[in-house]
């Protein structure tokens, strides 16, 4: 494609792809509605084709939202009786109002569908700016009613879906990396429970399944070239995310609660992460030149699948045999691949005060840790970001010599209900000595208590799993605000016992985070020292290399970083969009 005017439109011009398409299907009781789109990056347009099922609605509402709010959203209305479209929006009170600027162009109308076109960004403050990352779609239909002016009206039949109108350079893999062209000797291996087990009727449960790989890993090395979830049909709403670990020791096969005292003691050796998956994601493809190595170490290889069940409605008696499936080949590829975990340490040190609109926290992977990467650097070919219910924006940036040189991955409209692996094309090259910073922005305005960092669904995480080659020894590169920084703050500012109190008790000891207390603490988080996890696959820390013997991974100064000279985001003041209106509430 041509890239004329690319500099002026850098916030959405993507010169390495021509056209991208997608599709969602809304289930609207009387009839399904299918929304297809085709994005043309050269023309900077997106064409939506809306197809009706068995019954055509009288009114159709197609809304676009960053974080799932039906108010202050961009809307396309279709009146099937008049056969007319109307560019509209919803205000704060959920009222549907025609837009002063009609930016949708109707291209075609048939009995069973219609097609419209719009610019990706119109610089209309009532229009949604389509950007890289997640777009949340609201599709509502009215059968028999036409004079509906409030989207909350019970006469609407509503469904919510997720999609990516702009894939960016993180497009899906081409078919030559798919199953159709996998090596001829590929084996499909499913690791799950041998018999159905009931999902516990508690909100958060972690179940572990340990299995021996069913092929000769004693004498031969294999490559895993694709992985994907194996979910029991009907249980998609319960399986929130999974992690897959390779075990260093030979372990007896077992399944049960991960915290069960009967869990084999040698399962502690199952610590090498080889895959991670979260609700809404598809398969993990490896590029044709790389595969994840397994076997060849003179022993049987065991894997452990850890499943996070999220059961907020406390369902009883739901049987589940979910797990993970692997595509394995004995035809080794050029490179061994690895997976690395970036972001924040799972710790109550990384906690968010209540009633915060956009609370950002940074997880550091500093140069002292990336110095352990291969001399030629690594190529990141996929990225998988993960947070829980209050996560709104997630991204990882790359710095060299303290200056930002680009992003690894970014989602400005993150949803925990639709998570996805981003295939990075072109791949991102990270060199020894680079710094990677993973940022998560949280919205806790609906919470009255502190949201702690941790494993539960109501706790928070900030993680980016990066898939890369060639493999290195670095498996975890994460940080947390140092305990000494927190203890000093809570002791000096709030008069707490900084020596004996638990970190969680200190957070809970602050009864009022308003009147500048939150702003003051936010500054502490952004300048205070950090504790680092720079870990090998066996859980051991790398040696901290410094001429100063007093320095180490504990209580270290955070990296000094500076923004690069490029602009990768739309200027919300020069080119407004409805995405920005929340800033004025």
UniProtKB/Swiss-Prot annotation:
Its cofactor is Cu(2+). One of its GO terms (molecular function) is dopamine beta-monooxygenase activity. Cu(2+) B binds at residues 386, 388, 461. GO terms for cellular component: extracellular space; secretory granule membrane; synaptic vesicle. Glycans are attached at residues 32, 71, 449, 483. It is found in: Cytoplasmic vesicle, Secretory vesicle, Synaptic vesicle. Residues 1-21 form the signal peptide. Belongs to the copper type II ascorbate-dependent monooxygenase family. This is Tyramine beta-hydroxylase. It comes from Caenorhabditis briggsae.
């Amino acid at each position: 494609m041509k890239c004329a005017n690319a500099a002026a439109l850098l916030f959405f011009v993507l010169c390495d792809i021509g056209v991208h398409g997608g599709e969602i299907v809304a289930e609207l009781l009387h009839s399904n509605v299918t929304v297809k789109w085709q994005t043309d990056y050269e023309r900077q347009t997106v064409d939506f084709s809306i197809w009706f099922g068995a019954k055509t609605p009288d009114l159709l509402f197609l809304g676009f939202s960053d974080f799932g709010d039906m108010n202050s959203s961009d809307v396309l209305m279709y009146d099937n009786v008049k056969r007319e479209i109307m560019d509209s929006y919803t205000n704060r009170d959920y009222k549907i109002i025609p837009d002063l600027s009609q930016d949708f162009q109707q291209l075609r109308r048939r009995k069973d569908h219609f097609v419209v076109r719009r610019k990706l960004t119109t610089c209309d403050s009532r229009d949604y700016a389509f950007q890289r990352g997640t777009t949340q779609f609201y599709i509502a239909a009215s059968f028999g009613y036409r004079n509906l002016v409030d989207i909350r009206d019970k006469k609407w039949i509503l469904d919510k879906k997720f999609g990516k109108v702009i894939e960016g350079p993180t497009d899906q893999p081409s078919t030559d990396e798919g199953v159709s062209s996998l090596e001829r000797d590929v084996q499909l291996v499913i690791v799950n429970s041998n018999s159905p087990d009931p999902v516990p009727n508690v909100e958060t449960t972690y179940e572990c399944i340990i299995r021996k790989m069913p092929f000769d890993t004693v004498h031969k090395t294999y490559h895993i070239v694709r992985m994907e979830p194996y979910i029991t049909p009907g249980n998609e709403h319960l399986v929130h995310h999974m992690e897959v670990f390779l075990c260093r020791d030979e372990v007896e096969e077992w399944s049960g609660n991960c915290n069960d005292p009967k869990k084999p003691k040698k399962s502690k050796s199952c610590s090498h992460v080889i895959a991670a998956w979260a609700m809404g994601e598809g398969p993990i493809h490896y590029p044709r030149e790389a595969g994840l190595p397994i076997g060849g170490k003179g022993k049987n290889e065991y894997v452990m699948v850890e499943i996070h069940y999220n059961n907020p409605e406390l369902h009883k008696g739901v049987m589940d045999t979910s797990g993970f499936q692997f595509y394995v080949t004995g035809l080794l590829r050029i490179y061994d691949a690895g997976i690395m975990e970036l972001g924040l340490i799972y710790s109550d040190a990384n906690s968010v005060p209540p009633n915060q609109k956009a609370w950002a926290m940074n997880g550091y992977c500093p140069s002292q840790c990336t110095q352990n990467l291969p001399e030629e650097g690594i190529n990141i070919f996929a990225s998988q970001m993960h947070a829980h219910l209050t996560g709104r924006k997630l991204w990882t940036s790359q710095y060299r010599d303290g200056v930002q040189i680009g992003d690894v991955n970014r989602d400005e409209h993150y949803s925990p209900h639709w998570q996805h692996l981003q295939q990075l094309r072109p791949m991102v090259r990270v060199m020894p000595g680079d710094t990677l910073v993973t940022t998560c922005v949280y919205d806790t305005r609906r919470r009255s208590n502190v949201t702690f960092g941790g494993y539960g669904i109501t706790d928070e995480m900030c993680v980016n799993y990066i898939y890369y080659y060639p493999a290195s020894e670095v498996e975890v590169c994460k940080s947390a605000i140092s305990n000494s920084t927190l203890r000093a703050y809570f002791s000096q500012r709030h008069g707490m016992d900084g020596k004996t109190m638990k970190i969680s008790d200190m957070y809970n000891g602050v009864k009022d985070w308003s009147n500048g207390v939150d702003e003051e603490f936010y500054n502490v988080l952004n300048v205070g020292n950090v504790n680092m996890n720079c870990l090998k696959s066996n859980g051991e820390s790398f040696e901290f290399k410094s001429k100063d013997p007093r320095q180490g991974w504990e209580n270290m100064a955070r990296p000094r970083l500076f923004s690069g000279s490029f602009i990768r985001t739309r200027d919300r003041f020069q080119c407004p969009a409805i995405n920005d209106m929340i800033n004025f509430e």
